[in-house]
Curated annotation (Swiss-Prot):
Subcellular location: Endoplasmic reticulum membrane
Keywords from the UniProt entry: Endoplasmic reticulum, Membrane, Transmembrane, Transmembrane helix
Phylogenetic lineage: Eukaryota, Fungi, Dikarya, Ascomycota, Taphrinomycotina
Any Pfam family the entry gives: Pombe_5TM
UniProt keyword annotation of Secreted present: no
Mode of membrane association: Multi-pass membrane protein
Name assigned to this protein: Uncharacterized membrane protein C750.05c
């Protein structure tokens, strides 16, 4: 972990990898001036571009030492660097801040529209479609915490940065596993064509909460092994869940033969097509994000990456579960019920 020391005058963007390999590096004990302060703590700085502040002399200091939540007792290695960068226009920084606010407003507007749609089609709504509201809320909360992290990452509020970052990691892990549970239940038809048993709902929620608790402990105590296990779950188990869900939906579509279940078959077929598209498109979106991140401005790359994330995590699931798709299913259900009443 690295602590950075800075003053407040000029804003620049630098590659820390380049700076640590700079020929202008000086080692020694540098004075901690009154207008300098600790501003950032993070991991793997050699691969991250950040915005930092330098003083009028064109130099800044970096104090590096290992850190954990329990504290550390190590000697500080202080390094000074000479830099010469043009000052970024404050108006340009303000524009990027407005764009971030617009992104958050778009997510909240989408959440409001989804809630209104669920209320408008309340008679034909599925339980799974109500759960989408909770998922969008977690996504919006996650984006809000991300904005708070960016707000404090280069301010004097290092403690608040660490607090926001820890909460952000937990909410992101909760949202991801909640999404996985939702995918499995939808593929099995729970909350769509059949009710969700209480014991099954309690078990699913308990598993997600237990995983989040262990993940939080691993973050708090910096347990590397646990983090590696959860990374394996993130990148290995989730594709297996998608493959299982696709196979089960394919079985559902091929097993429906009667006229009464024709609308149900169309619903599952739409889910199957969307699941296959998401499963195939996700790696491509991540690949494009990496290309854009390496060839465009950092802020622009973040915006495009957020757009891809919105398409993958929000737009596609909401398309599958959009309430207007239930009209044919509800109509055929009413026709079947009326026919059954006439027979009685």
């Amino acid at each position: 972990m690295i602590d950075f020391v800075k003053s407040r005058d000029t804003v620049i963007q630098k590659s820390f990898f380049e700076e640590f390999n700079s020929q202008n590096r000086e080692m020694g004990s540098f004075a901690y001036s009154g207008n300098s302060e600790s501003v950032w703590t993070g991991e793997n700085i050699t691969s991250i571009w950040k915005t930092i502040l330098i003083n009028e002399t064109g130099s800044y200091c970096v104090a590096a030492r290992p850190m954990t939540m329990d504290g550390a007792e190590f000697n500080l290695d202080l390094m000074g660097y000479s830099v010469s960068e043009d000052q970024i226009n404050n108006d340009e920084i303000g524009i990027w801040n407005y764009i971030s606010v617009a992104e958050m407003g778009g997510v909240l507007l989408f959440l409001s529209y989804w809630i209104w749609t669920c209320l408008h089609f309340s008679k034909i709504i599925f339980p799974a479609q109500k759960v989408i509201c909770l998922y969008i809320f977690l996504f919006a909360l996650n984006q809000t915490l991300q904005e708070c992290i960016e707000e404090y990452v280069f301010s004097s509020e290092c403690i608040k940065y660490r607090q926001f970052y820890s909460v952000y990691e937990i909410i992101d892990f909760l949202r991801t596993n909640f999404y996985r549970l939702f995918v499995i239940y939808c593929a099995l038809g729970f909350g769509i064509t059949r009710t969700v048993p209480k014991y099954l709902m309690i078990k699913g929620i308990s598993i997600v909460i237990a995983l989040c608790s262990v993940y939080w402990i691993s973050l708090y105590k910096d347990v590397y092994v646990v983090s590696e296990i959860f990374d394996m779950i993130q990148y290995e188990v989730f594709p297996a869940i998608w493959v299982y869900s696709i196979c089960h939906l394919l079985k559902q579509c091929t097993s429906v033969t009667t006229y009464e279940n024709a609308s149900k078959a169309r619903f599952f077929r739409r889910m199957l097509n969307a699941f296959i598209f998401i499963f195939c498109a996700s790696p491509m979106l991540h690949y494009l994000s990496n290309i854009i991140f390496g060839n465009f401005d950092y802020r622009l790359s973040v915006i495009i990456g957020d757009l891809f994330t919105f398409m993958e995590k929000i737009a596609f699931p909401c398309y599958i579960m959009f309430p207007t798709h239930n009209e044919a299913l509800a109509y055929n259900r009413n026709v079947a019920e009326e026919a059954q009443e006439k027979m009685i």
